Design a protein with these regions (language model features):
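Intrinsic structural disorder
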Residues: 1, 5, 12, 263-266, ...
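Ribosome large-subunit tunnel/peptidyl-transferase-proximal elements
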Residues: 1-229
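Generic intrinsically disordered, low-complexity segments enriched for polar/acidic and small residues
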Residues: 26-28, 239, 265
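Internal, active-site/partner-interface "lid" segment
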Residues: 126-129, 133-138, 223-259
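Arginine-glycine-rich low-complexity intrinsically disordered regions
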Residues: 242-285
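Intrinsically disordered, low-complexity regulatory segments in nuclear proteins
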Residues: 274-305
Length: 305
């Protein structure tokens, strides 16, 4: 569902930070200044939200996942609820360094968490250990669950990351940019929109503001999931990993079709700037990006020669 301009106004999306804390790169999203506070242009916010929903829809229809990121305590519950409602993954405790750039190690921790949870169930392996050992494993399980419960179903790198506060989540934003993962983020007047594929200018501190925008993104994911074709289940795709150095190898006994599918080369992710230019429909931006890539190819050819 696309929120109206009136709903954005009532939710306080237009309230920015104090003028002395602003980032000059957010100038194009600022409407005015009132009592030492920047007022955000809601017309541009609404336009950016539409672009964000379009990008989210494209990612989900390709069969890729979306990761919600918000480590602010007062907003974590809201973001988690919206992520669970649309079947997306989420990080609401703290960003683990290397969550994306060192995904193989994180995946091992997720597998360990699943093993500990299975062993703690009735009739599980925990019953064969002493009470002290059970207590230690239970503590380890709780510690892992605190940081990894929202990404237990993540078997590969997400296709898109939705961030609540781009400035606070700068480590996650940096990792996503290194891997070419598109980012949709709520950017307050103190953020750097150049690091985001589709920045949504808005209040990233108010509960109603974040809830309204997160709900719009969640609705876009839910609608796209209903239209998307059936994808392999988590168990079927558990062995395939996006960040594998050797690529995806066919499983033992897999059919010819399955082997051909796994041998397909990985598609190269577009850069955030190219995604933003394509969504905005700016022909000049698209031509500039293509020209830049062509220049790099020519330089590479000259150096080889």
């Amino acid at each position: 569902m696309q929120p109206s301009l009136q709903q954005l106004l009532e939710a306080g999306v237009h309230f920015g930070h104090q003028t002395r804390r602003w980032n000059p790169k957010m100038r194009r999203f600022i409407f005015a200044e009132r009592n030492g506070i920047h007022i955000i242009d809601l017309q541009k916010t609404l336009r950016q939200l539409e672009l964000a929903q379009k990008l989210v829809r494209e990612v989900v229809l390709r069969g890729e996942s979306v990761l919600f990121v918000c480590t602010k305590r007062q907003l974590a519950a809201i973001v988690q609820a919206e992520a669970e409602r649309c079947g997306a993954m989420y990080v609401t405790e703290r960003w683990l360094g290397g969550l994306l750039t060192n995904f193989q190690t994180v995946k091992k921790q997720v597998r360990k968490l699943k093993d500990l949870e299975a062993g703690s169930e009735a009739g599980g392996e925990f019953e064969n250990y002493t009470k002290k050992e059970q207590l230690l494993m239970s503590r380890q399980r709780d510690k892992l669950a605190k940081n990894l419960s929202g990404i237990k179903s993540m078997t590969r790198i997400p296709g898109l990351m939705f961030v609540i506060d781009a400035k606070k989540e700068r480590i996650g934003v940096s990792e996503a940019n290194k891997l070419g993962i598109p980012i949709v983020a709520i950017c307050d007047t103190n953020s750097d929109p150049d690091l985001i594929s589709v920045p949504i200018a808005g209040n990233d501190d108010a509960i109603r503001s974040v809830e309204l925008i997160a709900r719009a993104i969640s609705d876009a994911i839910s609608e796209a999931r209903r239209e998307a074709p059936t994808r392999p289940t988590e168990e079927e795709g558990e062995e395939s990993t996006y960040s594998s150095d050797r690529g995806m190898e066919p499983a033992a006994g897999a059919g010819e079709d399955e082997r051909r599918r796994r041998r397909r080369p990985r598609r190269r992710r577009a850069k955030p700037e190219a995604i933003a230019a394509r969504l905005k429909g700016g022909a000049e931006g698209a031509e500039g990006a293509e020209a830049g890539e062509g220049g790099e190819v020519e330089e590479a050819g000259e150096s080889e020669g």
